Amino acid sequence: MDLIRGVLLRLLLLASSLGPGAAPLRSALRKQGKVGPPLDIILDALNCSAFSIQWKMPRHPPSPIMGYTVFYSEVGIDKSLQERSYGVPPGLDTPTSGRLDHQMIFEEVIGDLKPGTEYRVSMAAYSQTGKGRLSSPQHVTTLPQDSCLPPTAPQQPHVIVVSDSEVALSWKPGESEGSSPIQYYSVEFTRPDFDKSWTSIREQIQMDSMVIKGLDPDTNYQFAVRAVNPHGSSPRSQPSSTIRTARPEESGSGRYGPHYATDTEAGEDDDTFEDDLDLDISFEEVKPLPAIKEGNKKFFVESKMAPRPNPMTVSRLVPPTPASLPTTAVAPQPTPVDRKGKHGVAVMPRLFDTSCDETVCSADSFCVSDYTWGGSRCHCNLGKGGESCSEDIVIQYPQFFGHSYVTFEPLKNSYQAFQITLEFRAEAEDGLLLYCGENEHGRGDFMSLAVIRRSLQFRFNCGTGVAIIVSETKIKLGGWHTVTLYRDGLNGLLQLNNGTPVTGQSQGQYSKITFRTPLYLGGAPSAYWLVRATGTNRGFQGCVQALTVNGKRLDLRPWPLGKALSGADVGECSSGICDEASCINGGTCMASKADSYICLCPLGFRGRHCEDAFTLTIPQFKESLRSYAATPWPLEPRHYLSFMEFEVTFRPDSEDGVLLYSYDTGSKDFLSINMAGGHVEFRFDCGSGTGVLRSEEPLTLGHWHELCVSRTAKNGILQVDKQKAVEGMAEGGFTQIKCNSDIFIGGVPNYDDVKKNSGILKPFSGSIQKIILNDRTIHVKHDFTWGVNVENAAHPCVGSPCAHGGSCRPRKEGYECDCPLGFEGLHCQKAITEAIEIPQFIGRSYLTYDNPDILKRVSGSRSNAFMRFKTTAKDGLLLWRGDSPMRPNSDFISLGLRDGALVFSYNLGSGVASIMVNGSFNDGRWHRVKAVRDGQSGKITVDDYGARTGKSPGMMRQLNINGALYVGGMKEIALHTNRQYMRGLVGCISHFTLSTDYHISLVEDAVDGKNINTCGAK
């Protein structure tokens, strides 16, 4: 604008200096008149600190337009003091005159304004005649501050080390994305041992996970993330945990791929500032950002099309203003090259005649130069597919189409030796299956596996010559094959389908291979350059079902769920496998392999299509069927906060798998019991750190084992069979565990959702016959509420061997029958025909009474009981009546033996009285015992021993009980007696009298009983 004013001033001075001869010039200037105001002015508030102004040039200007000026000031403030102006000089593409120039739309963005403030705006054009007429003032108000909030900080990023120079980074958005959707993320890093500030990677990352390359080997790093929306950047996230890149000898990795500038910055929370560092850092985005999935989001900040219907639009962007809004660039239409995948999904990359510098690919795709056909192609990112890469593809068994590939971290600890097993199905005679090497072009060290004319070729080079090992048999197209590669130094081996191994040897003396590139599966982005090394420049066509490297099976799903870091144009081999599945009775279909499925049958159904109904007795779990069962916690979570104990009897068929698992959705709390490498592991977390207890000895597979795990506060105990008990402690200061999920048995519904430190990797394979939680038995028939593909184990109890309503009690590989009253024998097959006058009890026997005349004599303010008994066991219950279920400080009355002594106990609601007569009353002889209570006072007399007395604490005097009366034992005795007694009487009872004169016929008056036989001699 100063330039324009200077030109006009010099013209006027020149005219005046010419004197009278200049009159015609001055007259000509006056005749031309002032330029009119710009037309069709539109104001629009963009954000809190900027507005846009659009206009058309004045109609029929008398002379060419030399520029525009926008005048703006706050409404309500003295205009002469506050008015500001912004000059718009003419650009190369700015029309200045012409018949159609008035149709052009101009746009400018005015920034650095106050939030929520009303501005008065007008503008004028400049020409040779000077400033034109001002437009009529218009008003515009910037958006209020609360509508222009930046995002909150993302969650703490999770980092895993990929190699000596690479890490994989993932994160989740923060609590709020601010007032507008997140546009991109920025990543920062620091080296705690060297740096005093954070270095920013100057890239706009439109993902929520990435692989960062080019880091220093054997170096500590921390990473942080910021989220950016149109209103600004979030604070820095909580820094990641400190990780250390691998040493070069541990893991080869190259600094490959595009490199990007870095920026060392000092933020609001930094104490120091350093100059930019010349760090060679690159990144690879591996997962699309959900907020920008649709359409082409490749942003161009150079221009912005005005949102007007007129096709002729000129636009500019003011660089300092943060209000610029990016637009979608339109890519040229590619040459149509179509190929349909196995299930009809278009997968052939689009071919362009232009180079990647000029090609604009759609969102979720990237450009690669095509050296074979010329031009370039847009490839879909891993997990994306379809014509415009807009379809989500869930990848479990990757499908390749000749131009696809998947990348994994470079081969680790493999420079001297490695073993790789691959299960695949080929659809074409040629194609690259595996490649990993020193560089992307096959020069120097490498290994590869390729299908060449239906033969498999395993090649490797230690640096001085290539070994080529060719399978003796050819593969069958469309059939599944398993190939194993093994190399140790110069020597290599290839084995196809368990056939005769073929061996070979590389040339020269070098025996180690440096691996720096990713491990490529199904092809490689540089396959064109690999033909000399690998024998083919074609990608693999077909499916891969399993890949195992050095004994560890790789999860082929995209990271972070699996190990696949990136890829191109990958499909899912099992897609559509369930379309024609017929799972009935509530079963659901899922792919079990690349070309087969299983039905997830609900509890009580089994079979290929869940067609077979059955009664579950002894559950059998199978990893191949994704089995699991679930049961709710018997009581509220508060009952298990500080103490829990599980007793489990199980038979493992595999060295790994989850036995029990439960967790809290709102915290880090969990507990898990796993088979891990043949050992039992008990893991638990109170919210501040995980405790891990591991059995000292491995378990014998195919045999029954007894397990007991307990936790008191943050202390745990693990006991397996007769092994030495293992004790351990959880980390941190928290001491309680709250689990609001069900208890999962034998597996879980989703292995991706388990707690990070739970150790849960796969389902349990084997049988579980008993689970007891805090003395409460978890019954398969009644307590298992849901689950899938749980079948019956091969166990005698499955065949219901107990007759006449007897219940089968499994005892590892054997069993016992609990017989109802009136039956006896190994299988309860024998009816008791004679009346039982003196019942015999076996430790798991009992008699139950619910007659009101009996019950009222064992309650109230007074009680009087007499019994004659004999026993050979030191411990056993004689009599019990209490609330059902028992609660803390519940009323009860009991009589029994503990370590040979007789104990009379009762609680009236204010505390327990326990009166004991010491002795050895388990001598097998008959003894008489009398227990009397009058209010709080109690007395017990045994044989001719002197009486022992006692008194209950507190003020309560009445015995208020709602439960039945049990003699000789009871159901779940440890649970219902709060562990006062662990077993019933082993012996006989001949007399039972209440209230001194109310004689009870022990068997005849009983309403129920178990395992009652006739005692021998009186």
UniProtKB/Swiss-Prot annotation:
Coiled coil: none
CDD domains given in the database record: EGF_CA, FN3, LamG
A Gene Ontology molecular function term of the record: calcium ion binding
Keywords, comma-separated and alphabetical: Cell projection, Disulfide bond, EGF-like domain, Extracellular matrix, Glycoprotein, Heparan sulfate, Proteoglycan, Repeat, Secreted, Signal, Synapse
Domain of life of the source: Eukaryota
GO cellular component, one term: presynaptic active zone
Disulphide-bonded residues: C356-C367, C361-C378, C380-C389, C543-C573, C578-C589, C583-C599, C601-C610, C797-C808, C802-C817, C819-C828, C988-C1015
Polar residues bias spans: 231-244
Compartment(s): Secreted, Extracellular space, Extracellular matrix; Synaptic cleft; Presynaptic active zone
Subunit structure as annotated in this protein's UniProt entry: Interacts with DAG1 alpha-dystroglycan. Interacts with GPR158 and GPR179; transsynaptic interaction is required for synaptic organization of photoreceptor cells.
Protein's name according to its UniProt entry: Pikachurin
